[in-house]
Amino acid sequence: MRLSQWLETWFSLYVLPAKLAPSTVAMYRRAVNAVPKWLGEMELAQVTALELQRWLVQVARQTPRAAQLDRVMLSRSLHVAGKLGLCSMVIDQDTLPKPQHVPDKALVFTQAEARRYVEAVAIRPSYVLLLLCLVCGLRRGEALGLRWSDIDVEASTLTITHQRQRVGGSYQLRPLKSTAAHRSLLLPPELMRLLQAQHRTMTGYLVDTTPELMRKDHLFAIRSAHLPPVTIHGLRHTMATLSAGAGCPMKLLQSALGHSTYQLTADLYAAHLLPPSAAPALVWQGLAVI
């Protein structure tokens, strides 16, 4: 069996039946398709980590993130092949090191820009969803998936339980990616009153719209208020950045964002806390000896 044949078999028998998120399935499909012909035609039992590393190094020179995802596909598919006795290759950090990828720094709004954004987007149909992305740090799919049943008026809480994604030709509610993404957020009274005033949809969604229309409303606000090209996901980064800068504890921010680990939150946003150079002044102020 050639490597390309095994990858197609693995995709059909192990990826598709697993009911993964559509984006994850698409990622595996792209990675399988990306395997070059010279590598795919090699016999599975004869493929070595050296050949795989040679390919990943080539990919990483152009697109490091794609190389990372290609490695994930290879690692998981060949792990299954090894369990089935189809190959004996050892895939680990030594034989097939994870390609390094430093993501571009996300563009975010300043406090003043965020205010202008809210004023500009207030007249658009997706206003409430975009406001929740900015104030609560919701992901776009999470905002689109919000239903009236997710809102507890008495407790003033919003519970994130699903995300809305395109599946085939329609939009469907899908499970969140991780347990940590399930979370309840305490909303300010003003925001809760705004949600209560929202017209109730027949479908049960807080706002029944699409990612395309939501993006259209977002771009309208960006252009009309002459703001930097922050993305919808950048609204989430803005919330986290402003919260960290205001002194919000990282553990609390992790919970609010639905991150699976504290380290992920700290790596992304710790730099927005007060710089180490400010420590002496804070200690001196705390002593208040003069």
Where are these regions (language model features)?
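Phosphate-coordinating loops and pocket residues in cytosolic domains that bind phosphorylated ligands
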Residues: 8, 12, 46-49, 119, ...
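DNA breakage-rejoining catalytic core of tyrosine-based enzymes
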Residues: 45, 84-90, 98-119, 167-188, ...
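C-terminal secondary-structure termini that scaffold catalytic or DNA-interacting sites
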Residues: 155, 166-184, 189-191, 264-267, ...
